[in-house]
C-alpha cells in the first residue's frame, strides 16, 4: 500500500475532509494559524496511528501508556505506527540533560567504564594493579648498568621512635633501610624523634640492571610486596634519578586510595553509585540568597529592609530589638550603614554567643530567655524545610537562589567518577564541550591495542549521535545543558536527532514546525535531516510555514481558506508546482510572489540621543557585549542559533528593565556592568510563548479582562436585578452561579486505568459550567454559556455597542485570533496563539507611548498572511512612540525592521558578539554576517 486514505475527518474544525496522502514521502501541511493543520496532523493522523498501535498491546501494557482519544473520522487506512515530535513536551526534570535525552551520555558512561583509566585524585597516579612480571619488565627497561635498589615501604608518615620495627627488620636479616630519605645501616639505626612523622623503607635488594636478572628480581619483588602489603619502590642508588612506585593492589601507591571496579553506573548522576553526595547529582545547591532576602539596603530594619522582620511583624521585631541591645546597633539606621559584622550576625546568626531575648506575650507579660540567635537566613531555611504548607513554601521560594555545588563543582558526579581519564580527559570535561567540539574530540581520539577494539562500537554510536545533533543545527549546545533551559525548537530538534539515531523504518513521523528558532543557515541541514528520515523508508508529515520546507516537500497540503470556523478544508494539495498554480491557495500566492510582505519605502530614523545602553553583558557565551537599543524604533535581534540572542535580551536586558521599571524583586539578570537610558520608558512588557494558564479554567476571556465587563452586563439585566444576582454569580470559579456537580469545569474526569482518562460532559449542566438558574439570565437573547462559546469575530459583532468589550475584541482580531472562542481552554491554545493573546491584552491597555515591548520569535506558528497582520500591529505600537525589540529569524520580519542587531558569528563559544548593527540596508552589506547573506536578496 503506497498511500494513506483519509475519509470524513471532522476533528475540531475539520469539515468532513477526504485526503489521499502518499506514503514514504516528505509531506508539508501548511495554512493559516488556526486553520486546522494540527487537527489533521496530530489529532487525526497521529492520534489514530498511535491509538491503533497501542490497542494491539495487552491490557497490562496499555495501562502504562496514555491512549489517545479516537479522532472523529469515518475511515483511515494505510497508517503506520506513528511518532510525534512536538515542541510542547520540553522536560521540566532537572536531571534531564542534552546528553541523557539523546542517549549520548549512556554511551559515554559505557566507554569510560570499559576503557577509562582511574587516577588518584590527590597524586594523579593511574590506579592499576601490576603483576610481578610487569614490574620486572619495567625494571629491565631501565638503562643497562644503572645501579638501583628495591625498597619495601614499612612505615609511611607515622609518628614514633619505631625501635621495635627496626629491630624486627634486622632480625629478619635485612641490612639496610631508607629512613626519611637517608639510607642507613640496620645494625646501627639512627634514633628517631617521638613526635615527628617518619617514613621507613627497607632495602630488599640492590642490583645493577642486566638482562639476566629476571629470576632474582622476581623473588625480590615477592619479598618486598609481602613485607609492605603490595607496594614496592625502585630507587636509584646514586644521584637524584626518578623513582618508580609499583602496586600489586588496585590503589594509589602513595596514599593507598583505591576504588571499586569501573561500572557504567559509577558515571550516572541519576544513580546513588555515581551521584555527588552533596547535591544528589543535581549539580547545584539551593540557598537563601541575602540579595533576595534584603528588600532594600537603604531602608532601616524598622522600615522593612528585610521583609517580614520590620515593626509590623511584632514577634520577629522583638528578637531584633534584643539583638540590637546586645550588639549595640540602631534598628532605625539604614541596613547598609551597619558594620559588616553586624550584618553577618543578623543574617547568619550569633554562633555560640548567647543573647538575652525579651519576649512580650499578648497579655503584656515579659519573659526573658537566653539562647543564640539563629540568623534570618537559617530561620528561613528551617521554615522551608519544616513547613507542610504550600503557600508558605511558595512565599519562601522567592528568596532562594542556586549556585554550583561546592563539592562537585557542578559536574553532578562523585569524586571517583571525576577522576577517570581517557587520554587525559575526564567525562565532566567532555560533557562541557560543545557538541561540535565533542565530535572533533572523538574523531581524533586514538586508543591502542585492546582498548581500541573494546571502544570501537561504542565510539561509532557516540559519533553518529553527535553528527545527527550537528545536522539539526545544535552544534553549539553542550551535552551537560539542562533540558529545562532549552527552547521549544531546540527540544524538538533534539528529539528529532534521537529518532534518526534510532534508525526506524516504516514509521510515520509527525513534526510540528521543526524550523522554530533556526537561522536560515541551519535550515538547509534540518531539511537534509528530514529527507534522510524519508529516505530510510518513513512517511514524514511536517506542519510548517517555512518557505524552504514547503519548496522541499514531495507533497504539500494547504488547509484553509481562513482560520477557525472559516478553515478546516483542503484548499490545495499536490506538488509545489500544483500549489503555485492554484488560484485559491493563499500559500501559493505568497510563494509565487503574487502577494508579498512589502519592504518599507522609508525607515523610521534613529535619534542618536535616545538610546538604551547596556554595557559589558557577559552571561553564558556573551563576550562583554555592549548593546545599544534605539528608543521608539522597531528593532530586530538576529543571529544564528546559539549566538546569544536570548541570553542578551531575555536573561539580561529584560530582567534589568523588569527590576528597574516594574519593581520586580526576584528577576536575576545575567552578569553585566552597567545600563543607562531606561528613563525613556515607564514599563517593560515581555510577551513570550508560555501558556496563558495551565488549567482549562483559564481562557482568552478571563486573560484579556473581557470577562469582567461581560459579567457586569449580565448582572445589570432586568432579570438579574430582580433576582439579586451580582457579577460573581456569572463566574464559574466561585460557588453561587457555577454548576457544583463539576465545579464549573463543564466536564468530569473518569479514570479508566488501562484506557485513556475519559472527560465526559457533566450530566447536570451538560457541559455548560453554570447551574440552571444562572443560565436563565439572558443578555440580548444569549446566556452566559452561549457568549463564551462565541468566536471572537461573532462576539465583536454582538458586543459592538459596548466600547470597553468591543475594543478588546478588536485587538484579538488585529493579531489574527478572530477564530478562537472566548471560553476556549488555555490548554488547547498553541504557543503562538498564547503569545498573540498576550499581545492583544497589552494592545488593549491605555497606551502611554513609553512602553518597551520584548517579543521572542512572535512568528512561531504563523503563516505569511498572519505575519502581515502581526507586523501591522507591531508597527502600530512603534508609531505610537513605543519601543519594540523582537528576537526573530523570519526574514519577512527582519526586512521590515527599523534597526537590526546581529549576533554571531557562530553559535556557542563561537558566538556572543555583536557583528553587525544598523538599518537592514546597512547590515545586508556586512561581510561575515550569516544574516546579511540571506537578507540581501530580500531587499531587492
UniProtKB/Swiss-Prot annotation:
Pfam families: ABC_tran, UvrA_DNA-bind, UvrA_inter. It comes from the Bacteria. PROSITE patterns: ABC_TRANSPORTER_1, ABC_TRANSPORTER_2. ATP binds at residues 31-38, 639-646. Signal peptide: none annotated. HAMAP family: UvrA. The UvrABC repair system catalyzes the recognition and processing of DNA lesions. UvrA is an ATPase and a DNA-binding protein. A damage recognition complex composed of 2 UvrA and 2 UvrB subunits scans DNA for abnormalities. When the presence of a lesion has been verified by UvrB, the UvrA molecules dissociate. It is found in: Cytoplasm. The gene is uvrA. This is UvrABC system protein A. A zinc finger (C4-type) spans 252-279, 739-765. Its main location: cytoplasm. Forms a heterotetramer with UvrB during the search for lesions. Residues 309-586, 606-936 form the ABC transporter domain. GO terms for cellular component: cytoplasm; excinuclease repair complex. Belongs to the ABC transporter superfamily. UvrA family. GO terms for molecular function: ATP binding; ATP hydrolysis activity; DNA binding; excinuclease ABC activity; zinc ion binding. Keywords: ATP-binding, Cytoplasm, DNA damage, DNA excision, DNA repair, DNA-binding, Excision nuclease, Metal-binding, Nucleotide-binding, Repeat, SOS response, Zinc, Zinc-finger. Coiled coil: none annotated. One of its GO terms (biological process) is nucleotide-excision repair.
Amino acid at each position: 500500500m503506497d498511500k494513506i486514505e483519509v475519509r470524513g475527518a471532522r476533528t475540531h474544525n475539520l469539515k468532513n475532509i477526504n485526503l489521499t496522502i502518499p506514503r514514504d514521502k516528505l509531506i508539508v501541511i501548511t495554512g493559516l494559524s488556526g486553520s486546522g493543520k494540527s487537527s489533521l496532523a496530530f489529532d487525526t493522523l497521529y492520534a489514530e496511528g498511535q491509538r491503533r498501535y497501542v490497542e494491539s498491546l495487552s491490557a497490562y501494557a496499555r495501562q502504562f501508556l496514555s491512549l489517545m482519544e479516537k479522532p472523529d473520522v469515518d475511515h483511515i487506512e494505510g497508517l503506520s505506527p506513528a511518532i510525534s515530535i512536538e515542541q510542547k513536551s520540553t522536560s521540566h526534570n532537572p536531571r534531564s540533560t542534552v546528553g541523557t535525552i539523546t542517549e549520548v551520555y549512556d554511551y559515554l558512561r559505557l566507554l569510560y567504564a570499559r576503557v577509562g583509566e582511574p587516577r588518584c585524585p590527590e597524586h594523579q597516579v593511574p590506579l592499576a594493579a601490576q603483576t610481578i612480571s610487569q614490574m620486572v619488565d619495567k625494571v629491565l627497561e631501565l638503562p643497562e648498568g644503572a645501579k638501583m635498589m628495591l625498597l619495601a615501604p614499612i612505615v609511611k608518615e607515622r609518628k614514633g621512635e619505631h625501635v621495635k620495627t627496626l629491630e624486627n627488620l634486622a632480625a629478619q636479616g635485612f641490612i639496610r633501610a631508607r629512613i626519611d630519605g637517608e639510607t642507613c645501616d640496620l645494625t646501627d639505626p639512627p634514633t628517631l624523634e617521638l613526635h615527628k612523622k617518619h617514613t621507613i623503607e627497607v632495602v630488599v635488594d640492590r642490583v645493577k640492571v642486566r638482562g639476566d636478572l629476571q629470576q632474582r628480581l622476581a623473588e625480590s619483588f615477592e619479598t618486598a610486596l609481602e613485607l609492605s602489603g603490595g607496594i614496592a619502590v625502585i630507587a636509584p642508588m646514586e644521584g637524584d634519578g626518578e623513582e618508580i612506585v609499583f602496586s600489586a593492589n588496585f590503589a594509589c601507591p602513595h596514599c593507598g586510595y583505591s576504588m571499586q571496579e569501573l561500572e557504567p553506573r559509577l558515571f550516572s548522576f541519576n544513580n546513588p553509585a555515581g551521584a555527588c553526595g552533596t547535591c544528589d547529582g543535581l549539580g547545584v545547591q539551593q540557598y537563601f540568597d541575602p540579595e533576595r532576602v534584603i528588600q532594600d539596603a537603604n531602608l532601616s530594619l524598622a522600615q522593612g529592609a528585610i521583609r517580614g522582620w520590620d515593626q509590623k511583624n511584632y514577634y520577629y521585631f522583638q528578637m531584633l530589638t534584643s539583638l540590637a541591645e546586645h550588639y549595640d546597633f540602631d534598628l532605625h539606621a539604614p541596613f547598609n550603614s551597619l558594620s559588616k559584622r553586624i550584618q553577618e550576625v543578623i543574617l547568619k546568626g550569633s554562633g555560640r554567643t548567647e543573647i538575652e531575648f525579651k519576649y512580650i506575650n499578648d497579655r503584656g507579660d515579659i519573659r526573658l530567655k537566653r539562647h543564640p540567635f539563629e540568623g534570618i537566613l537559617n530561620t528561613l531555611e528551617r521554615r522551608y524545610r519544616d513547613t507542610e504548607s504550600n503557600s508558605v513554601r511558595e512565599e519562601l521560594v522567592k528568596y532562594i537562589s542556586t549556585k554550583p555545588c561546592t563539592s562537585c563543582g557542578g559536574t553532578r558526579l562523585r569524586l571517583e567518577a571525576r577522576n577517570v581519564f581517557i587520554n587525559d580527559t575526564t567525562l565532566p570535561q567532555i560533557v562541557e564541550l560543545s557538541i561540535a567540539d565533542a565530535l572533533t574530540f572523538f574523531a581524533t581520539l586514538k586508543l591502542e591495542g585492546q582498548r581500541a577494539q573494546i571502544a570501537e562500537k561504542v565510539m561509532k554510536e557516540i559519533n553518529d549521535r553527535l553528527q545527527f545533533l550537528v545536522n539539526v543545527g545544535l552544534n553549539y549546545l553542550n551535552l551537560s545543558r539542562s533540558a529545562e533551559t532549552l527552547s521549544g525548537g531546540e527540544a524538538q530538534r533534539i528529539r528529532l536527532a534521537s529518532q534518526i539515531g534510532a534508525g526506524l523504518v516504516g514509521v510515520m513521523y509527525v513534526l510540528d514546525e521543526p524550523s522554530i528558532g533556526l537561522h536560515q543557515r541551519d535550515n538547509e541541514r534540518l531539511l537534509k535531516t528530514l529527507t534522510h528520515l524519508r529516505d530510510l523508508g518513513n512517511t514524514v508529515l511536517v506542519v510548517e510555514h517555512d518557505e524552504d520546507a514547503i519548496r522541499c516537500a514531495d507533497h504539500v497540503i494547504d488547509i484553509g481558506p481562513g482560520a477557525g470556523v472559516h478553515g478546516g478544508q483542503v484548499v490545495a494539495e499536490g506538488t509545489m508546482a500544483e500549489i503555485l498554480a492554484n488560484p485559491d491557495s493563499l500559500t501559493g500566492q505568497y510563494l509565487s510572489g503574487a502577494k508579498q510582505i512589502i519592504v518599507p519605502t522609508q525607515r523610521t530614523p534613529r535619534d542618536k540621543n535616545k538610546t538604551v545602553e547596556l554595557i559589558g553583558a557577559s552571561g553564558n557565551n556573551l563576550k562583554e557585549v555592549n548593546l545599544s537599543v534605539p528608543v521608539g524604533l522597531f528593532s530586530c535581534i538576529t543571529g544564528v542559533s546559539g549566538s546569544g540572542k536570548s541570553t542578551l535580551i531575555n536573561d539580561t536586558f529584560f530582567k534589568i528593565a523588569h527590576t528597574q521599571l516594574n519593581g520586580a524583586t526576584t528577576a536575576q539578570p545575567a552578569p553585566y556592568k552597567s545600563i543607562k537610558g531606561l528613563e525613556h520608558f515607564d514599563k517593560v512588557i515581555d510577551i513570550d510563548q508560555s501558556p496563558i494558564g495551565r488549567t482549562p479554567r483559564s481562557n482568552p476571556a478571563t486573560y484579556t479582562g473581557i470577562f469582567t465587563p461581560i459579567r457586569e452586563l449580565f448582572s445589570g439585566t432586568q432579570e438579574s436585578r430582580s433576582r439579586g444576582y451580582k457579577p460573581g454569580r456569572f463566574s464559574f470559579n466561585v460557588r453561587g452561579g457555577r454548576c457544583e456537580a463539576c465545579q464549573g469545569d463543564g466536564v468530569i474526569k473518569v479514570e479508566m486505568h488501562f484506557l485513556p482518562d475519559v472527560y465526559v460532559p457533566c450530566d447536570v449542566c451538560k457541559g455548560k459550567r453554570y447551574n440552571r438558574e444562572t443560565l436563565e439570565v439572558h443578555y440580548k437573547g444569549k446566556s452566559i454559556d452561549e457568549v463564551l462559546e462565541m468566536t471572537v469575530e461573532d462576539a465583536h459583532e454582538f458586543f459592538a455597542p459596548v466600547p470597553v468589550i468591543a475594543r478588546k475584541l478588536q485587538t484579538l482580531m488585529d493579531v489574527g485570533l478572530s477564530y478562537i472562542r472566548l471560553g476556549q481552554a488555555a490548554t488547547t491554545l498553541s504557543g503562538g496563539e498564547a503569545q498573540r493573546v498576550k499581545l492583544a491584552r497589552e494592545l488593549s491597555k491605555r497606551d502611554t507611548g513609553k512602553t518597551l515591548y520584548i517579543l521572542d520569535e512572535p512568528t512561531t506558528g504563523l503563516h505569511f498572511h498572519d505575519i502581515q497582520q502581526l507586523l501591522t500591529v507591531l508597527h502600530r505600537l512603534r508609531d505610537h512612540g513605543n519601543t519594540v525589540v523582537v528576537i526573530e529569524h523570519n526574514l519577512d520580519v527582519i526586512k521590515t525592521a527599523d534597526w537590526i542587531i546581529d549576533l554571531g558569528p557562530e553559535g556557542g563559544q563561537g558566538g556572543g558578539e555583536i557583528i553587525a548593527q544598523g538599518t537592514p540596508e546597512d547590515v545586508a552589506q556586512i561581510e561575515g554576517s550569516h544574516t546579511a547573506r540571506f537578507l540581501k536578496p530580500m531587499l531587492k
